[in-house]
Amino acid sequence: MDQEAKDLLVRGAAQLGVELTSAQVGKFALFAAELRKWNRKINLTAITTEREIALKHFVDSLSLCRAVGKGGKLLDLGSGGGFPVIPFAILHPKSEVVSVDAVEKKIIFQRHMGRLLGLSCFQSIHARGEELAGRFAGHFDWIVSRAFSDIPTFVRMALPLLRPNGAIVAMKGQGGREEAETSRPALEVLGVEIRQVLEFPLPFSGDGRSLIVMGRKNES
């Protein structure tokens, strides 16, 4: 990334309450370079400029920290090119972080990035979310997704993998609150409640973002 993109990353993260070290910025720069290089051969993302990657991938991913605390075990369902899971792993390198996607080429890229960035606690799995229950039943404190599916479908897939008192977080755009409200009847059937809806603008772009935080009823 050029200096302008790095500055946007650092300042955007700071607006979200995240302070990045120079070493972390260096890892994000390497991630951006590899993402652009691999994207020429395989379709990982439609976001390709350094500025867009800094804001719409990296800063957007770091906004997850408004809902997810440090520590605990995190799963990203349908992680695509590695968002938000790899930025989260860069920020919290000692946390157990697991990424799952059904598209093998995206997982190959994620594993490459995990090795290159030295993310020893990061694991990337080629599978569908519903295939994880036998291996990871009740395992995760946090289960997240970014533009993966509708909320009820995501929650159905996440519930068997969630620890008691764990949280499910859907990262959505400006219409997140409306989607959450229309999802309430389906969530009620699943025994899940909406604990919090966090709405905020993405730094510098002003695009609306929402974090829908959910959990099992009677556990909050």
From Swiss-Prot:
Gene for this chain: rsmG
Family: Belongs to the methyltransferase superfamily. RNA methyltransferase RsmG family.
Record's keyword annotation contains Transferase: yes
Record-given protein name: Ribosomal RNA small subunit methyltransferase G
Keyword terms of this UniProt record: Cytoplasm, Methyltransferase, rRNA processing, S-adenosyl-L-methionine, Transferase
Catalysed reactions, semicolon-separated: guanosine(527) in 16S rRNA + S-adenosyl-L-methionine = N(7)-methylguanosine(527) in 16S rRNA + S-adenosyl-L-homocysteine
Record localization: Cytoplasm
InterPro entries in the cross-refs: rRNA_ssu_MeTfrase_G (IPR003682), SAM-dependent_MTases_sf (IPR029063)
Top-level taxon of origin: Bacteria
A GO molecular-function descriptor: rRNA (guanine-N7-)-methyltransferase activity
Its job: Specifically methylates the N7 position of guanine in position 527 of 16S rRNA.
GO cellular component: cytosol
Main location: cytoplasm
Record keyword Cytoplasm present: yes
EC number from the UniProt entry: 2.1.1.170
Binding site for S-adenosyl-L-methionine: G78, F83, G129, E130, R146
Organism: Geobacter metallireducens (strain ATCC 53774 / DSM 7210 / GS-15)
PANTHER family linked to this entry: S-ADENOSYL-L-METHIONINE-DEPENDENT METHYLTRANSFERASES SUPERFAMILY PROTEIN
